[in-house]
Amino acid sequence: MSDQKLNDAMQSMLAEQTPILATVIKESGMPNIGPKRSLRVYDGNHLIFNENTGGQTLENIKQGSKIAIAVIDRPNLDGYRFVGTPEVHLDGVFYDNAVQYAADNGMKTPKCAVLIKVDEVYTLKSGPTAGQQIA
């Protein structure tokens, strides 16, 4: 069994669909949610996205919030929820990756890169296993 959390099917869906990212705010527990069009697979255990606005999502991450990402393939009633630990990078290899991604995709230079260590993966496939942890 591989130690890699992100299998080929997951990586493909992340590349083809717009992931939705949620973070939890402080003690209040109020969720913050939004699409992350720059979210992509970094390697078999990490996701990465460019933070462009420096708004509530970044603030929540700086306050220690975990992160949850949902990606769905609605026509096929399939999807995944990834739960992970985010790290903010203002320079170095991860930031360089974000800058290059922005340049390659006609985006503004990001304020920072957010690298997410995937801790858990859940299936969102319709049926009796929906919501079960798979990695």
Kindly label every feature range from the protein language model.
Residues M1-A135:
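Binding-site signature for planar aromatic cofactors or substrates
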